Every structure is written in C-alpha cells, then in structure tokens.
C-alpha cells in the first residue's frame, strides 16, 4: 500500500514513484513536488479534499487563490473560458517556465482554488519531475510553495521535509531548484491587454519584448486577484 510510505519519504524520479505520487493525489493527499522555482505542496486541483489539505497544511488564508500546474499550453487552454492572443504569445515564449497567467475560467474549475473569482491562475513548470507527474496525472495540480504561509519558500526536498515532513507523506526529490524565486504573474484586462500582477523570475523588460503594451501598475489593485498579491505573501 502506498500509505506505508513514512512521513517525509524522499524518492528519486522514477515511474514507480510517479505512480505512488498519483495514487496519493487521487486519494486527496498532498505531496512535495519540485519545480524550477520552488518546491510545491501539490494536490489534485479538482479534488476538494486535496485542495482543503493544502490550505490546512500551509495555514494559508482561504481568500488567497492557488495556481494550477498543467503539462502544456493545450492543457491550459482547455481550462480557460478565454485565452487571449497576448496570453498565447507569452505562453509560447515562456512556457514551460516561471510565468503564471490569470485568465477567465471555465465552470469546471472549482471556486475553492480561485477564492470564488471568475479567473484562475495557470502555468507550465519547467522541471522534468513536475512535467512527468503532470503528464501522467489526469487532472491539473495545485502546488503553492511547500511551506507554512508567510515563511521562506523551500528550494530542496530536505527543506520540505524539515518544515512539513510530518504533514507530507511523499516528496519527489528533483534536486535543488534552479531559480529559487516564484513565478511572474500576468493577468489581463477585459480587452485582453496584459498586466503584471507580480514580478518574479521573468522581468518586466523580458515581458515587454513579447508584449510592448503590457501594464505594470503597482499598488493599483487592493483586492487579491491572484496568488502573490497578498501583502504578506511569500508562499
């Protein structure tokens, strides 16, 4: 049985371990998943029990949305009610990679992960372990940083185990994260004009090379429209 894996079990990325991770996600458990930015606390985005476990383990406010992680641009498009032309342009340049897009969501995306908003955040991570899991698992995965809300984000499997080991039955060890900085988040106006919600690994200049008209208005939005906009966010 997969649940015989002890708390904080770290494994190399092989097909058996991807199956073990998938079984845990399917049962509503959380796991540690590496990405190029930080290690994420992963759960099945369409499993209410798993999503609730993410919020519980992290002690994350329920009004702070989560980011969907998917395997490809096509998968992201399948969850979006509208995928703006400039969103596609950005995705084609920066995916897989540390760019999160905030777009109108289809009805099957639960309010539980969007904090009741009509938009959802999505990205394709650039890490072989994360991509292997996302390609093997049928549903999108939420994976905020695997730490208590407001504390330093983990960049190694050992860091996850030290902080959350008794709460996480399995951590996929993908080595140290290449970047160690959260993704850049870009939303869109109703007209499809991109707007930076959070700067991260991708700079404003890099974004402007693809979308010269991109907006950057720090402090304009008081509402938490996307992950990373909460004043005390580093999670």
Regions found by a protein language model. Give the residues of each.
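Active-site-adjacent structural elements in enzyme catalytic cores
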Residues: 3-235
């Amino acid at each position: 049985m997969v649940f015989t894996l002890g708390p904080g079990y770290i494994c190399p990325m092989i097909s058996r371990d991807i199956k073990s991770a998938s079984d845990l996600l399917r049962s509503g458990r959380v796991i540690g998943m590496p990405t190029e930015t930080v290690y994420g606390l992963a759960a099945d985005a369409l499993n209410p029990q798993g999503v609730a476990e993410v919020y519980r383990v992290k002690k994350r406010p329920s009004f702070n949305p989560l980011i969907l992680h998917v395997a490809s641009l096509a998968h992201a498009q399948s969850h979006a009610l509208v995928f703006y032309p400039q969103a596609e342009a950005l995705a084609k340049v920066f995916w897989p990679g540390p760019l999160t897009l905030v777009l109108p969501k289809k009805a099957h995306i639960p309010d539980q992960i969007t904090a009741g908003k009509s938009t959802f955040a999505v990205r394709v991570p650039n890490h072989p372990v994360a991509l292997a899991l996302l390609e093997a698992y049928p549903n999108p995965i939420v994976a905020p940083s695997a730490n208590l809300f407001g504390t330093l984000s983990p960049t190694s499997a050992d860091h996850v185990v030290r902080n959350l080991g008794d709460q996480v039955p399995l951590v996929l060890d993908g080595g140290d994260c290449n970047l160690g900085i959260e993704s850049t988040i870009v939303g869109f106006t109703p007209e499809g004009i991109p707007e930076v919600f959070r700067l991260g690994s991708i700079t404003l200049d890099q974004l402007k090379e693809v979308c010269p008209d991109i907006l950057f208005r720090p402090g304009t939005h008081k509402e938490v429209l996307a992950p990373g906009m909460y004043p005390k966010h580093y999670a």
